[in-house]
Amino acid sequence: MALDGEAYQRAAAIFGETISALSDAEWELSVSDDWTVISTVAWVVVGDSQITNALHQGEIAPVSEFDAAVLGGNPVATWRGTAVAAIGALKSTGAAERVVKHPGGRFAVIDLLGQRVTENLVRAWDIGKAVGRPVDIPDDLADACLDFWAEHAEAVLAGGVLPDEPIEPPDDADAVTRLLALTGRA
């Protein structure tokens, strides 16, 4: 399975289902030491907006800082608008094959998709864990993400893409467990 527009749409749907089920009180729950549910959602929204920017403007701008205020008064609606725009942009012929500008050089949209599919899946899992409602990541999407990151080992080894110290999964771990371990989750 390729990490294409369809894979992004499936991963975004999982993320959307996860945040649509949140109660008002759950938005401020801690996801990790540095993240709350709302800051995690803002991070995904800002990241997913890069798909639309890449395809409509031909470039990806770096995201060094972000503010949860980007979500406005209705975080789910803001997420939905961003995801729908990205899905729409990906439906144009040859969208995933485009190469766009990036501060580090040229960047393939298909590589951005690999990052965004992974991000949507693991961030949904993070939020589900924080609120006590486990999120099921489909095995085929987890497998595809693992294949993607295996093909991008140099980026992983350069640092800043995945955690500096991934968790070692058990030898008999399934694809979902291995993906979570690769992204520093147990």
List each model region and its residues.
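Structured surface interface patches that mediate subunit assembly and partner/cofactor docking
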Residues: 2-14, 21-31, 36, 53-71, ...
